[in-house]
Amino acid sequence: MAIVRLTRDRIEGDPIMIVVRCLACVVASLTVSALGVTIDYTTIENPGNGSNTNGWGAVSSSYRLATDETPNAQYVEFLNRIDSAGINPNGIYNARMGSDALGGITFSLAAFSGAKYSVKAGTNPNTVPYGNAPVVFVTWFSAARFVNWLGNGQLASAASMEDGTYTLNNQTSGAIPPRNQGSGVQVALPSRDEWYKAAYYEPGSAHYLMLQGTNTITQTTVLYAANYGGDATPTLGPIAVGSYVNSTTPYGLRDMLGNVIEYTDTAGAIDFDVGRPQVFSGSWATPVAEIGFWNVNSPPIFRGATTATGEIGFRVAEVQAVPEPAVLPLCGVGAAIAVVVARRVRRGITSFPSLARRVLSFDL
């Protein structure tokens, strides 16, 4: 309709300008649909598996989890699409992403609309190009907004990050909200059980495996490699995506031990941890003596939802939504729309670092 109005309004004007403007509209629409975040998902099968001895890891349906952690380059796409004017709604950009050596994203109010945010030039303290390093200095709420935006089709609208899998309504602190019930597929942060199964469960068996690595970042092609150790080793920050090519979980995911701590959407329910997200993995800064506390048999660890450090990031999941208690049948156009929405293609990631494992005696 915009093109029709333009043609009608300018019919007495320069016909070349009319054609140019019409073509600009077409190109703009094609550009928006062609660009964006593309997630490399790994399918986690074996639905209905049993839990580990700690009660974690049982998942009733198949789901998909990003093979790698979310990188700076993808978060930049999100920032520019959501915030073309550079007003930073609900603090989705943390200034330390630009000022801290571990952060990988810069902001310039003087830049063109839709290009206010960019991947930082150069490399991080681990000599990793910033675009390939996991995004850090993100709160749980910023990570939740990222997945809401993905699930809503990567729209150029700040409203698209406030509702979806999580109803945020401009919330930036406090207890994390639960996933919304619904139908079809949701883009989400993984739950405790989804993350745990993808990291440790051996498909088709009754075993949960231990991820075990070295802390020497030069050994990127050996088995059982991971990025941890902090300042005591050369691991001075997150490493390049896809570095540990021979170290994966049983399902083939990377960096589920070390590199960055990862948020889940499972909230604590006891004492000080009520409403705080459970986290996994450990990070590049986790001391060698403490990395075992982040493995298969570790106790539950929680972080504040507003925590934003150079050690914490996230990865994306695609899961089956939990049905609402009573869903009225749809008909006609409403049903058609529901089918289209449920089948929307959700895309987003590239490649990243890795891990490894060793069988323990955690038989069910």
Predicted ranges, named:
Residues 1-16:
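Short, Lys/Arg-enriched N-terminal segments with co-localized hydrophobic residues
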Residues 18-25, 327-330:
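Sec-dependent signal peptide recognition
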Residues 31-33:
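N-terminal signal peptide c-region/cleavage motif recognized by signal peptidases
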Residues 35-36, 246-249, 272-322:
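Disulfide-stabilized, aromatic/cysteine-rich ligand-recognition loop
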Residues 37-108, 134-151, 258:
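A short glycine-rich, aromatic-capped structural motif
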Residues 140-293:
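Functional-site microenvironments in short loops/helix caps that host divalent-cation chemistry
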Residues 324-342:
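A short, hydrophobic C-terminal helix/tail in secreted or cell-surface proteins
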Residues 339-363:
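C-terminal membrane-anchoring or membrane-association module
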